[in-house]
Amino acid sequence: MFTLAPSILSGDFAYLGEDLKTIKSAGCRWVHVDVMDGNFVPNITIGMPTVAALRKYTDLVLDVHLMIDRPLRYVEAFCKAGADYVTVHVEADTTENNLLALDKIHALGAKAAVSLKPNTPASAVLPFLDKVDMILVMTVEPGFGGQSFLENQMEKLAALRALCAERNPECLLEVDGGVNAQTGA
């Protein structure tokens, strides 16, 4: 089974409300919200006010992907803005701070996730595996939309599926980047 979460980054920012209606009318129940700070990745996108505006406009699951340095500083604000899932990158801070971020996300009633860049091994999730509701695997280099799917990430997904089956069978796996009708099949 899979869930399709279209990325708001692919939308027209002047018409995000209309884009959310289109996503929902197409049968999707999730929307992926990429937050970039210009430091962790070279691009800058949106912040908490946009997430809060999206939350007021839709009941879709807001899957907020923080591609930002030291996300512990901001997870509370994104949860309070209405994120249903908040994803932090294992590479964005220390293990200790990322564990604190996951705990804070859960304490605020949201689901917690970690993400791995393409060059980060599957084993990097081990310190977090018992605390996450989802693991996101970047299938492009994070920072810009429109890139091609990195097929070599399929091995990482298989390794993560095995780890989750053993230690956290309820954990969801998510791929982000280059997903289309061919790569998503």
Label the model's feature ranges.
Residues M1-T87, A92-L100, K104-A107, K111-A112, ...:
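Conserved N-terminal beta1-alpha1 strand-loop-helix module at the mouth
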Residues H89-E91, M138-E141:
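Short beta->alpha connector loops at strand-helix junctions that form conserved
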Residues T95, P121, G143-F144:
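Short glycine-rich, flexible loops that bind phosphorylated cofactors or substrates
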Residues V114-L116:
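Short, hydrophobic beta-strand segments that form beta-sheet elements in well-ordered domains
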Residues N119-P121, N180:
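Short acidic loop-to-helix transition motifs that present clustered carboxylates
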